[in-house]
Amino acid sequence: MAVLKGTLDLLVLKTLSWGPRHAFEITSWLEDRSGGRLECDDSALIQALHRMEAKGLNAAEWGVTENDRQARYYRMTPSGLAWLRGQGDELARDIAAIGAVLALKTGK
């Protein structure tokens, strides 16, 4: 399934909380950790990375991949960590509330 609308920035920052990564590594990390359930569109990911960089939530620098290719590596900034903590907690509460409703017996 595609990443749910409004969650991409949060998921990308969660990925970057585990260390700097280039775009392909971010996509792979999300797919691996979600058991293949989350798929991230490449163009949406790049737009999100640039948007978050403009907000100071991440920073980027050029590096070399394990295949000797140039790639932009993204890392989370302290502002990004603060944003992740606040938004992550809020989303976790929202998911728990939705889960509580869905766990109810179906009427009629």
Describe the function of each predicted region:
Residues 1-44:
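N-terminal helix-turn-helix DNA-binding core of bacterial DNA-binding proteins
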Residues 14, 28, 47, 85, ...:
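A cross-family signal for key residues in well-ordered alpha-helices
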Residues 45-52:
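Basic amphipathic alpha-helical segments that dock to polyanions
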Residues 53-70, 75:
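Beta-hairpin "wing" of winged helix-turn-helix
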Residues 76-80:
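Accessory beta->alpha helical hairpin/"wing" motif in late/C-terminal subdomains of nucleic-acid enzymes
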Residues 82-108:
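Amphipathic alpha-helical dimerization/coiled-coil segments
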